Amino acid sequence: MAVRSTAAPPTPWSRSLAEAQIHESAFVHPFSNIIGDVHIGANVIIAPGTSIRADEGTPFHIGENTNIQDGVVIHGLEQGRVVGDDNKEYSVWVGSSASLTHMALIHGPAYVGDNSFIGFRSTVFNAKVGAGCIVMMHALIKDVEVPPGKYVPSGAIITNQKQADRLPDVQPQDRDFAHHVIGINQALRAGYLCAADSKCIAPLRNDQVKSYTSTTVIGLERSSEVASNSLGAETIEQVRYLLEQGYKIGSEHVDQRRFRTGSWTSCQPIEARSVGDALAALEACLADHSGEYVRLFGIDPKGKRRVLETIIQRPDGVVAGSTSFKAPASNTNGNGSYHSNGNGNGYSNGATSGKVSAETVDQIRQLLAGGYKIGTEHVDERRFRTGSWNSCKPIEATSAGEVVAALEECIDSHQGEYIRLIGIDPKAKRRVLESIIQRPNGQVAPSSSPRTVVSASSASSGTATATATRLSTEVVDQVRQILGGGYKLSIEHVDQRRFRTGSWSSTGAISATSEREAIAVIEASLSEFAGEYVRLIGIDPKAKRRVLETIIQRP
């Protein structure tokens, strides 16, 4: 049943407009607008509030059994055409049995294949969506060809072909949802046709039919799927958790050369109020800095500190997400628990979690980011004096969470012994870090509280110094190892404001040749830069690269 709308308003193209060709079995609602050379196939439903204007770009084709829902806009540019399934050129081609849902925008040149589903408020512009694709809500598809049978999640922004090629395949539950929506609109079409037929509508009006409301909840979308094409599901879960906890979100980028020195540069500030806005801002940062490292961080605006740092893109591509991140059930508190994630990063508030300190987790993260291998060794008190260490089970893990689990297993197996963490350069086949993480009297205290006075001449240490030091025994061990390995030491500092941008300032290399002199210089730096972040740097003078970065003082 074809219904003609009111006359089109005058435009520069009005004089040469062709008449729309509408199949007699199609239903076009009186409150819709169809202008120009539009071919509408059999059993099509055009709902109220739609605007199909083939005046500037022309012609349009809408295949049989397609339903176009309320508020859909189909328009085309004067230039640009797509090739339809009949090998003719069209400004817009919509195939058979397709579904364009509420408020969708199809702007030509555009192609939507057979049995495709375009979700609410999604936009297709200068693009081709293959047959059998499902596009969920609020998505943008522009300047790409989406292969057939692909799933575009809600909020996705697909603007380059690499993104389109990486899209996941449609799953059965996605088809079920699309068929559910299409079924409702086919029922509407039958209802509209019945309403126009007095013989059909009269008996229904005379019947007293009790209405009911279904309590069944339809699964609208795959909750575990990627809700953004460029970002993993795990990153999205982290963003959602941070926003729910009232934290701010930021992002930083750095090229491969500066990554070694930790010279991160902030991306554009993210003022997002919703997950969708935050994801869009992150994707913009990824697009602007492809081929670089990009990391996401969360900020506690009250404590003015970071609660999360995780790398979401590496130069060889986006970090593959996993489902290992689990948002805590309650707000983060003072215990500063560490949460591992599939990107090989974690976040901590400076205390301990389980059997591994937050400082050890930071060291693990730095070693993995530098491409180093990680190992562990243990020794009892008697053999500690002779340095007869034994290796624990080899660690083949590539993420911080897996390494932490392996460390905890080693700690459980060798309670009452010394255990140390080893960083190994697989290319040079040498050690870049040796750090004791457990002593017979318990776990090594983290160095996140630089004000604590710790004696370096502890009975459990194999080497004694003449004076007490503000540094923790772990930092003293690191200084000893760096000097013993022939490396240089340096100090960097930064205030709280510049810490967010990673703008560290160096005090220059420490020229000390003995452990005592180096500790004295480090303590002088801590006093000079009280109230700032201070980190210790180990430098390989031959390879001219850093072998250690560890924060030894916080504000």
Swiss-Prot record:
Cystines in this chain: C194-C200
Subcellular location: Carboxysome; Cytoplasm
Annotated stretches, region: RbcS-like repeat 1, SSUL1: 223-315
Superkingdom in the source lineage: Bacteria
EC number: 4.2.1.1
Record region (Has carbonic anhydrase (CA) activity): 1-209
Annotated segments matching region Disordered: 323-351, 441-464
Temperature dependence: Optimum temperature is 25-35 degrees Celsius for N-terminal 209 residue fragment.
Active-site residues per Swiss-Prot or TrEMBL entry: E56
Region (RbcS-like repeat 2, SSUL2): 347-440
GO biological process, one term: carbon fixation
Family stated for the protein in its record: Belongs to the gamma-class carbonic anhydrase family.
Name of this protein: Carboxysome assembly protein CcmM
Origin species: Nostoc sp. (strain PCC 7120 / SAG 25.82 / UTEX 2576)
Top-level taxonomy: Bacteria, Bacillati, Cyanobacteriota, Cyanophyceae, Nostocales
Gene that encodes the chain: ccmM
